[in-house]
Swiss-Prot record:
<comment type="function">
    <text>Catalyzes a reversible aldol reaction between acetaldehyde and D-glyceraldehyde 3-phosphate to generate 2-deoxy-D-ribose 5-phosphate.</text>
</comment>
<dbReference type="GO" id="GO:0016052">
    <property type="term" value="P:carbohydrate catabolic process"/>
</dbReference>
<dbReference type="InterPro" id="IPR011343">
    <property type="entry name" value="DeoC"/>
</dbReference>
<comment type="similarity">
    <text>Belongs to the DeoC/FbaB aldolase family. DeoC type 2 subfamily.</text>
</comment>
<dbReference type="Pfam" id="PF01791">
    <property type="entry name" value="DeoC"/>
</dbReference>
<dbReference type="GO" id="GO:0009264">
    <property type="term" value="P:deoxyribonucleotide catabolic process"/>
</dbReference>
<feature type="active site" description="Proton donor/acceptor">
    <location>
        <position position="102"/>
    </location>
</feature>
<protein>
    <recommendedName>
        <fullName>Deoxyribose-phosphate aldolase</fullName>
        <ecNumber>4.1.2.4</ecNumber>
    </recommendedName>
</protein>
<dbReference type="InterPro" id="IPR002915">
    <property type="entry name" value="DeoC/FbaB/LacD_aldolase"/>
</dbReference>
<dbReference type="GO" id="GO:0005737">
    <property type="term" value="C:cytoplasm"/>
</dbReference>
<dbReference type="InterPro" id="IPR023649">
    <property type="entry name" value="DeoC_typeII"/>
</dbReference>
<dbReference type="GO" id="GO:0004139">
    <property type="term" value="F:deoxyribose-phosphate aldolase activity"/>
</dbReference>
<keyword id="KW-0963">Cytoplasm</keyword>
<keyword id="KW-0704">Schiff base</keyword>
<keyword id="KW-0456">Lyase</keyword>
<feature type="active site" description="Schiff-base intermediate with acetaldehyde">
    <location>
        <position position="166"/>
    </location>
</feature>
<dbReference type="InterPro" id="IPR013785">
    <property type="entry name" value="Aldolase_TIM"/>
</dbReference>
């Protein structure tokens, strides 16, 4: 995909516009909702901490943007192996009104050789979501590093009922990479094409957006790359893509997600 403007437009339509900072406030989330209603069209979703779901829902309704989904996070960001806590957090997120829940897989337990706890956690959290929310599972590929572990985490998450597998929390040094994406997309192609993929963190501009879109299209077909099965998790990417589309001035450098 050499047409960067086309990649930028698709990237916005596939974006989970994210703020997951310790200093988030109601006003920052309100501002995020306004940004999600971008000059190039709405993002697919916003991703915020659970306590901000009510104000986000109110704001999106006021903006006549009910089509923008609200995603949130649980077992975040450390991916602990306490299933009960992950389940309680997921239950609360759904009760708050989340459309989508991004749960962190207990990746360190997997690195220690425990495959069971991750499977059981995803299965239990999926049951909490029921028909009310979709479940995205963050495997933290940048910490797993080993291709075999990235593959195993992806397989376990899908086998346990994940609707999406997601690379990263954005809270570790290495986030989405093309190498991890290729492994995860290949597992999806082998196990269940209805499962989605979400690279998160580290995608900075239209050129990188195009690389991930091209990779997904090569493995699963261009018609697979829709908001139902592909999302970008990002905060600073939106302004960069809008700049590519010549809709805003050049964005300021950022070290954010």
């Amino acid at each position: 995909m050499t047409d960067l403007k086309k990649a930028a437009q698709r990237g916005i339509e596939l974006m989970d516009l994210t703020t997951l900072n310790d200093d988030d406030t109601d006003q920052k989330v309100i501002d995020l909702c306004h940004k999600a209603k971008s000059p190039a069209g709405n993002t697919a979703a916003i991703c915020i901490y659970p306590r901000f779901i009510p104000i986000a829902r109110k704001t999106l309704n006021e903006l006549d943007c009910e089509d923008i989904k609200i995603a949130t996070v649980t077992n975040f960001p450390h991916g602990n192996d306490d299933i009960a806590i992950a389940v309680l957090e997921t239950r609360a997120a759904v009760a708050y009104g989340a459309d989508e829940v991004d749960v962190v897989f207990p990746y360190r337990a997997l690195m220690d050789g425990n495959e069971t706890v991750g499977f059981e956690m995803v299965k239990a959290c999926k049951e909490e979501c029921g028909d009310d929310a979709i479940l995205k599972v963050i495997i933290e590929s940048g910490v797993l590093k080993d291709p075999a572990l990235i593959r195993k985490a992806s397989e376990l998450a899908i086998d346990a009922g994940a609707d999406f597998i997601k690379t990263s929390t954005g809270k570790v040094p290495v986030n989405a990479t093309l190498e991890a994406a290729e492994i995860m997309l290949t597992v999806i192609s082998e196990k269940n094409r209805n499962v989605g993929f979400k690279p998160a963190g580290g995608v900075r501009d239209a050129a990188q957006t195009a690389e991930f879109l091209d990779l997904a299209a090569r493995i699963l077909g261009d018609d697979w790359v829709t908001p139902q099965t592909f999302r970008f998790g990002a905060s600073s990417l939106l302004n960069s893509l809008l700049h590519t589309l010549e809709l805003v001035d050049a964005p300021k450098p950022t070290s954010g997600y």
